[in-house]
Amino acid sequence: MSHSWDGLGEIASVAQLTGLDAVKLIGLIVKAANTAWMHKKNCRQFAQHLKLIGNLLEQLKISEMKKYPETREPLEGLEDALRRSYLLVNSCRDRSYLYLLAMGWNIVYQFRKHQDEIDRFLKIIPLITLVDNARIRERFEYIDRDQREYTLDEEDRHVQDVILKQESTREAASVLKKTLSCSYPNLRFCEALKTENEKLQIELQRSQEHYDVAQCEVIQRLIGVTQAAAAVEPDSEKELTKKASKKSERSSSMKTEYSYDEDSPKKSSTRAASRSTSNVSSGHDLLSRRASQAQHHEEWHTDLLACCSEPSLCFKTFFFPCGTLAKIATAASNRHISSAEACNELMAYSLILSCCCYTCCVRRKLRKTLNITGGFIDDFLSHVMCCCCALVQELREVEIRGAYGTEKTKISPPSSQFMEH
């Protein structure tokens, strides 16, 4: 399985790299390492190690050194090793993601092998006798001490274990969808699977040309994984389509009910009174429906320190906090609370120095009503640090969500009537 990685020169055109000296080749490797999307850590470590060598070689006249036979052959060997290293790093960007994932440990072995080979050629070159100064010797010692460790990342190892299982499961499809969305951000999942399948077919053809049976089996297994994931994807799309159709039907039925209510005339004052009470009950139903539909906790729509974005609300809350607190408490408790009641509560708790405790309890009730993430300590610290900012954030959240709670029922008297004699 490993000898196909030894023949990486067949994958890219080596002729394009001929004529480049060691310093330029190192520059190409560093540039390719920055754009690699597989084995990123190994590529960057390898590039950092080669930078040390490149900084040393920049001070030498390589063209002059090639005139001497004792330095020409080691330099040419070093350049050949750097060309193979460039092909290795460049393959971490251009080759199939699944293939690179399956061949992970072989690639790690190649990084170690290339680093040892380059260091071996570097020691053969008699640089110390040509450039005899202490700074060069110190850099040689630093290069000897710089031994990088190449391994497979934990996340890539987990994905490799899931994909290379004997049975194709939905777990493999979900993991594959997550990883391919990162590797192909501009493509849909089906298009990314198609691209990977095409690349895997090319890898399979190359392995068959090398008569590598073990690697062919791995690639065929990866092709099966992509086909299984492609079969799972239409089922999930059908489920999403069904859910969307149900939502559209529900919304259309609500619209028809609303239009019917608008068209129906108001016949009597008693019907208007019953409609006002029904609005109160519908407010209860709306809040309970919102609470039941929330499957997961949500976040605050506004930041705690973003109160200055609405200066008028900030000034109103600073000079008249009771009005703001009354609206928040109404939405939190689902019961109409007037500004006077909120003011009485604030005054009562202020006498025992527990004003912040009362307001943080209101914030906690509001979080539970709107299903927002957080804890009691977060609520307490928010009101201790800046109670005004916390109240502004809570009222803005109520306005954004439209959760005004139960408003006080207003009963209007019937219109005046005249009796004819």
From Swiss-Prot:
Single GO MF annotation: calcium channel activity
Keyword Membrane: yes
Alphabetical list of Pfam families matching this protein: MCAfunc, PLAC8
Region of interest (Disordered), ranges: 233-288
Major site of localization recorded for this protein: membrane
Source species of the chain: Arabidopsis thaliana (Mouse-ear cress)
Tissue expression notes: Expressed in roots, leaves, stems, flowers and siliques. Expressed in vascular tissues of cotyledons, leaves and primary root, in the promeristem and adjacent elongation zone of the primary root and in the shoot apical meristem. Detected in the stele and endodermis, but not in the cortex, epidermis or root cap, including the columella. Not expressed in root hairs or in mesophyll cells of leaves and cotyledons.
CC annotations in GO: plasma membrane
Name this protein carries in UniProt: Protein MID1-COMPLEMENTING ACTIVITY 1
Coiled-coil region: 188-218
